[in-house]
Amino acid sequence: MTNSTLPPAQLHHLPASSIKSGAVNGAAADPVGTNEKFLQILRAPIDYLLTIPGKDVRGKMMNAFNQWLQIPEEKLDIIKEVIKLLHTASLLIDDIQDNSRLRRGLPVAHSIFGVAQTINTANYAYFLAQQELNKLDCAAAYEVFTEELLRLHQGQGMDIYWRDSSLCPTEEEYFEMVGNKTGGLFRLAVRLMQLASNKDCDFVPFVNVLGILFQIRDDYLNLQSDLYTKNKGFGEDLTEGKFSFPIIHSIRADPASITLTSILKQRTEDEDVKRYAISYIESTGSFEHCRRKIDELVGEARMCVKDMSPEDAKVADGIMAMVGLGAGGLSI
C-alpha cells in the first residue's frame, strides 16, 4: 500500500479525531489569528517592548511629512502600524545580535522571554506588517516593502560581518550600510506615503540624508551621552565591538595603532577600559569629526528642500529637530 492510499489518520500518525477537527490535511483548527490565548503568548515580547516608552520619532516624522503629502488619516494609520511593527521587530532582533542587556533602561526582551521565543515573535511581526499592506489596496506597496526589507537586512548583515570579522570599513562603506539599515524604515514610511498621496513630490533624497544623520548622531551619543548610558549602558558600542562612525575615524586616523581594534576585540565590560577607549577616540579628533560631518550633512539635507516655501521649510526644520538636529546643530 502506498502512502497515498493510507487512511488519513495513519498517514499523519494522528488519531482520526485530529483529522476531523481540521488540524491537518491543509486546514488549521482555527482561522489564522483567532486563538487569543496563543496570540497573547506569541506577541508577549512585542507587547513588552511597546510598553517601554520611546520617543516615537518615526510616528512624529510621518505626521510631519503628511503636512506635505496629505494622505487620508486612515491610510496614515495603516502605514504607522506597518512601521511600528517592523521597528519593534528589528529592535528585538538587534538586541539579540548585539548581546544587549538594556533597552530604554529596562531588560531586553530576550532576557525575559528567551532567545528562541523572541526571534519567533520578531519574525511573526514582519508578516503582521506585510499583512497590514492589504489595507492600502496598492500592489506597488508590496514591491516597496520587499525592496526596503531586503536593504535593511543587507545593511544589518554588513554591520554584523565587520564586527564579527574585526574588519574596519571605510567611511564610504559605512554610509552605504547605514543608508540600507537605518535609513530603511524612514525611507519605507515615506515611499508608502508617497504611493498613497496625490502630490507629485519625491522626498526620498531628503530621507536618505536624515537616515545617515540619525545614525551618526546615535553613534556619537553612545559614547558621549549620560542619558544614553542610562538607557543602554555605558559605551555599549565598545562592548559590542561595533565599528561606529567615531570609532572608524579614530582607527583610520592612525592605521599603525592597534589600540582601539584590540579593545573592540575584547568585548570588554570594564568601564575603566571603555573610558580609556573614549579618551583615545577623543585624542584622534574623532568626536569633533562627527560634529563636523553632522553639520555638513545638515547642509545637504537643507539643500534637498531648498526650493520649498517658507511655510514648508518650517516643516523640514521640525523634522530635523525630531532627529536631534535643530537649528543649533547637534542636540542631545
Curated annotation (Swiss-Prot):
Site (described: Important for determining product chain length): 126
Uses described in the biotechnology field: Diterpenoid pyrones display various biological activities and subglutinol A shows insecticidal and anti-HIV activities.
Reported cofactor(s): Mg(2+)
CDD domains: Trans_IPPS_HT
Pfam families tied to this protein: polyprenyl_synt (PF00348)
GO function term, MF aspect, one: metal ion binding
Gene3D superfamilies noted in UniProt: Farnesyl Diphosphate Synthase
Chain residues that bind Mg(2+) 3: 218
Keywords assigned by UniProt, alphabetized: Magnesium, Metal-binding, Transferase
Protein residues bound to dimethylallyl diphosphate: 103, 181-182, 215, 222, 232, 242
Binding site for Mg(2+) 1: 94, 98
Enzyme Commission numbers on file: 2.5.1.-, 2.5.1.1, 2.5.1.29, 2.5.1.10
Positions with a binding annotation for isopentenyl diphosphate: 55, 58, 87, 104
Highest taxon listed in the record's lineage: Eukaryota
Keyword Transport in record: no
Enzyme class: transferase
GO BP terms, alphabetized: alcohol biosynthetic process; mycotoxin biosynthetic process; terpenoid biosynthetic process
Cofactor note: Binds 3 Mg(2+) ions per subunit.
Catalytic reaction(s) noted: isopentenyl diphosphate + dimethylallyl diphosphate = (2E)-geranyl diphosphate + diphosphate; isopentenyl diphosphate + (2E)-geranyl diphosphate = (2E,6E)-farnesyl diphosphate + diphosphate; isopentenyl diphosphate + (2E,6E)-farnesyl diphosphate = (2E,6E,10E)-geranylgeranyl diphosphate + diphosphate
Listed pathway(s): Secondary metabolite biosynthesis; terpenoid biosynthesis
Function: Geranylgeranyl pyrophosphate synthase; part of the gene cluster that mediates the biosynthesis of the diterpenoid pyrones subglutinols A and B. The first step of the pathway is the synthesis of the alpha-pyrone moiety by the polyketide synthase dpasA via condensation of one acetyl-CoA starter unit with 3 malonyl-CoA units and 2 methylations. The alpha-pyrone is then combined with geranylgeranyl pyrophosphate (GGPP) formed by the GGPP synthase dpasD through the action of the prenyltransferase dpasC to yield a linear alpha-pyrone diterpenoid.
Name this protein carries in UniProt: Geranylgeranyl pyrophosphate synthase dpasD
Organism name: Apiospora sacchari (Arthrinium sacchari)
Gene behind this protein: dpasD
